[in-house]
């Protein structure tokens, strides 16, 4: 497994952990999904977009010969030699945008590596990563931004190239192959999440409705669609969408959190309690679900209960956002020293993270 360091050329290729693998659909393409969305007036992007001159240059200077793993290293060195140091940022960019900006999130760097790798003849595709990725709270609901990596070769003779920013050798990462259209749907779901966070809930809903219809086997899409529906004052439809999704994805923890939010929005406390109990049965050790419980308890002003949930989520898997919310819960409970320690830990984990900086400004000087 290759994790994203400051210096691209310093990385090494290792065999990754693969699980729950499915066949990549040969007919799936990211540009076809984009074209279908554009035809409906949706601002969909092709994550693999890369200027032809960049592709021609990498082919000329890296070449198509040599072992695949050696060629992959040459692509990374070529990037560093031509573009210098790349920086992690919370923006989701296409391959071309990441190349020009020299920054982006794990999705952006994966897009760039796959586009360049394919240009030099590498057999490389997306894989979905199940871990604590980017998650954002919006008025008590739970939006999920997808984390992907690249796979060189095919299982079992494969290498995983993962551009996540925080390596953790003690964490089990499960990988599942993705077709290009699936990856493009997740990429555009991330863009729709940003639309929602920026206050454009109606466009986010339209994008997510389209994407979930195109790729119904990706739970993130229907999860985020339900949040958009809720934000657009369509709680009954959001409830129906979530109930159907829970039947199809009974172990996807964010669905329980959002279904609880919608039930409370509709004034159905009994259903919310039932959903919490069901979610606890399947997801008590899932840091995403535990974090969502913390958000609900914080919203109920149960700050001690929220702190317990946020601390458990952070201990299940290191997360700057969980530590930041732990700081918020401690401070709301009047526990200033505990809040100071938690926020300092969050800043140390992700000093440039936009959410952490916003929280730091909100809480003021500690």
Task: Describe every region a protein language model picked out.
Residues 89-222, 236-244, 248:
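Long, contiguous interaction/recruitment modules in multidomain scaffold/adaptor proteins
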Residues 221, 255, 289, 322-323, ...:
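TPR alpha-solenoid repeat register
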Residues 35-97:
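Secondary-structure boundary elements
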Residues 190, 224, 258, 292, ...:
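Canonical tetratricopeptide repeat
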Residues 210-211, 244-245, 278-279, 312-313, ...:
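Canonical positions in the second alpha-helix
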């Amino acid at each position: 497994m290759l994790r994203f360091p400051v210096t691209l050329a310093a990385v090494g290729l290792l065999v990754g952990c693969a699980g729950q693998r499915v066949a990549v659909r040969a007919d799936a393409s990211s540009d076809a999904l984009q074209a279908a969305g554009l035809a409906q007036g949706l601002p969909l992007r092709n994550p693999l977009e890369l200027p032809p001159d960049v592709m021609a240059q990498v082919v000329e200077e890296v070449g198509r010969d040599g072992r695949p793993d050696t060629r992959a290293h040459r692509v990374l060195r070529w990037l560093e030699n031509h573009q210098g140091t790349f920086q992690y940022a919370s923006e989701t960019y296409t391959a071309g945008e990441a190349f020009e900006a020299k920054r982006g999130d794990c999705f952006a760097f994966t897009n760039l590596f796959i586009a360049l790798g394919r240009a030099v003849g590498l057999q490389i595709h997306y894989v979905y990563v199940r871990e604590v990725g980017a998650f954002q709270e919006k008025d008590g609901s739970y939006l999920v931004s997808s984390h992907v990596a690249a796979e060189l070769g095919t299982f079992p003779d494969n290498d995983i190239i993962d551009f996540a920013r925080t390596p953790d050798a003690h964490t089990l990462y499960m990988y599942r192959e993705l077709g290009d259209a699936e990856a493009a749907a997740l990429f555009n779901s991330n863009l729709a999440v940003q639309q929602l966070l920026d206050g454009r809930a109606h466009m986010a809903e339209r994008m997510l409705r389209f994407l979930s219809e195109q790729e119904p086997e990706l739970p993130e899409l229907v999860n985020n669609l339900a949040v958009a529906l809720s934000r657009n004052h369509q709680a009954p439809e959001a409830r129906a969408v979530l109930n159907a999704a829970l039947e199809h994805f009974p172990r996807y923890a964010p669905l329980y959190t959002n279904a609880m939010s919608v039930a409370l929005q509709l004034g159905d406390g009994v259903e919310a309690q039932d959903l919490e109990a069901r979610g606890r049965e399947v997801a008590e050790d899932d840091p995403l679900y535990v974090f969502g419980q913390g958000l609900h308890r914080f919203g109920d002003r149960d700050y001690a209960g929220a702190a317990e949930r946020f601390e458990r989520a952070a201990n299940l898997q290191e997360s700057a956002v969980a530590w930041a919310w732990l700081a918020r819960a401690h401070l709301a409970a009047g526990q200033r020293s505990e809040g100071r320690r938690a926020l300092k830990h969050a800043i140390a984990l992700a000093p440039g993270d936009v959410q952490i900086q916003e929280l730091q400004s909100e809480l003021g000087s500690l």
